[in-house]
Amino acid sequence: MSENAQLNGLCDRFRGFYPVVIDVETAGFNAKTDALLEIAAITLKMDEHGWLMPDETLHFHVEPFEGANLQPEALAFNGINPHDPQRGAVSEYDALHAIFKMVRKGMKESDCSRAIMVAHNATFDHSFTMTAAERAGLKRNPFHPFVTFDTAALSGLALGQTVLSKACIAAGMPFDGAQAHSALYDTEQTAQLFCEIVNRWKRLGGWPLPVATPE
């Protein structure tokens, strides 16, 4: 494989990390006590020229775990009725088991050693995902235990905006406020935003890194 082809590979772009975009909707801010209600995940891939793009998607409504807190303010904010049978909710175990399986498959195909979570204000999504995985007894968690790519920080650097909707608009992307706070829609927008920031850096000449030539 040529050096150029290697640099256009996903594993070499992020030092062996496999980026996966995640968004969660919850019944509060405390990952240990408040319910995880919805989660979506989108894997990413690179074409032969090194341009990053969304790949596979999974989306689940999630049943609150036994004894979970359901904060009324959080439910009013995201508009989720946890008791609605039409949600088709699944257990935390089933949702995360399916997502982790998809992620591990993508890691293997991309020759990556570890998944890294991409999320907007990533500490929140990371904490709920990792806590739910531990609570569900899932042993093969592919995500790095603390390293993330936070699109709020990246957007502040690249676009001068930190709010997801404003960052998307600044990047030239449409944003439908009526669909915001759906885990699927927010994950789709975050994935497109992350890809645009990474690809914009490439277009500006920031990647591949210049190779120092001996004098």
Curated annotation (Swiss-Prot):
Residues reported in the UniProt entry to bind Mg(2+) 2: D23, E25, H181, D186
Keyword list, A-Z: Exonuclease, Hydrolase, Magnesium, Metal-binding, Nuclease, tRNA processing
Cofactor(s) recorded in Swiss-Prot or TrEMBL: Mg(2+)
Entry GO MF terms: 3'-5' exonuclease activity; magnesium ion binding; nucleic acid binding; RNA exonuclease activity, producing 5'-phosphomonoesters
Record-level GO BP terms: DNA replication proofreading; tRNA processing
Boundaries of every Exonuclease domain copy: 20-194
SMART domains for this protein: EXOIII
Binding locations of Mg(2+) 1: D23
Pfam family, one: RNase_T
Enzyme Commission code: 3.1.13.-
Enzyme class, UniProt record, top EC level: hydrolase
InterPro entries registered for this protein in UniProt: Exonuclease_RNaseT/DNA_pol3, RNase_T, RNaseH-like_sf, RNaseH_sf
Any one Gene Ontology cellular component term annotated for this protein: cytosol
Keyword Iron among record annotations: no
UniProt xrefs under CDD domains: RNaseT (cd06134)
Entry similarity comment: Belongs to the RNase T family.
Function: Trims short 3' overhangs of a variety of RNA species, leaving a one or two nucleotide 3' overhang. Responsible for the end-turnover of tRNA: specifically removes the terminal AMP residue from uncharged tRNA (tRNA-C-C-A). Also appears to be involved in tRNA biosynthesis.
Annotated protein name in UniProt: Ribonuclease T
Biological source species: Klebsiella pneumoniae subsp. pneumoniae (strain ATCC 700721 / MGH 78578)
